[in-house]
Amino acid sequence: MVTVAELQALRQARLDLLTGKRVVSVQKDGRRIEYTAASLDELNRAINDAESVLGTTRCRRRPLGVRL
């Protein structure tokens, strides 16, 4: 069972990834490689799953139609 705290941690991880705070760099033999510790698609999928379990999904409302 997913907790609200775990959902918040997933959202923070996504924010960190998007803002570049989760970039890992390795330097060896004069070569430098940078990569992210998690993929954005995996984080979004995990967040959607957690929201579904907790019942906190954000349902979009239909646009209101205008009748004249």
From Swiss-Prot:
Any one of the GO CC terms: virion component
Disulfide pattern: none
Domain of life of the source: Viruses
Signal peptide span: none
Main location: virion
UniProt record, GO biological process: viral life cycle
Subcellular location field: Virion
Swiss-Prot/TrEMBL keywords: Late protein, Viral capsid assembly, Viral release from host cell, Virion
NCBIfam families documented for this protein: phage_HTJ
Record note on quaternary structure: Monomer in solution, assembles into hexamers on the prohead. May bind gp8 and portal protein (Potential).
General function of this protein: Plays a role in morphogenesis of the virion head after genome packaging. Presumably interacts with the portal vertex to stabilize the packaged DNA within the head after packaging. Probably binds to the head-tail connector protein gp8.
Family designation: Belongs to the lambda phage gpW family.
Full protein name: Head completion protein gp3
